[in-house]
Amino acid sequence: MSTTTITKAKNFDVETITYGEPQTNARGGKSIKIMSGGRAINLQFPITFTWGVNKWEGDNGAPDKFDMSLQFDKSNISSKKFLDAMVALQSKLITDSVTNSSKWFGRKKIIPEVAEAMWWPMVKYRKDKNTGEPDMDSDPSLKVKIGCYNGEWSVDLFDMTGNPTFRSRVSEEIAETIQGSKAPVDLV
């Protein structure tokens, strides 16, 4: 029986990242498991503000999707370390997509600029109203997917004392339980 190891985001080292083989889903899209030290990545985030869970209705019989944006607070040391870890992960994924372009994209070689253009950023900054460029002085956010497959949630939420506030395999009321809250998050 394996045990789950949870890493604090401030201790996360992108140099431990490894990848699984590309998998093709029923719709033809590809996904690649991202692992740390050969295991699933389980990160514990510092207290982070969120505007709640978003529900995106699936088209043509596709299942609904759920996500939430976590707001970084650059003035908070723990949050800044979490941000730095996510920016480092984002950079590593772009670099490794160039190295693995043949396996991942079926292209012999791509240049970093192409990989970056194909990439949808994980860490997002609001746009400057005048220039349309990212406002790097603002507090960025990180969008995370929340798994719900065939009505089964793949997320557990706990309060500050470690007591469960939401356990997986519960109804879609999760979207209403954490709206506008600040909570530490373990991303599995």
Give residue ranges: language-model regions.
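Extended serine/threonine-enriched, polar tracts that run as long, contiguous segments within proteins
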Residues: 128-188
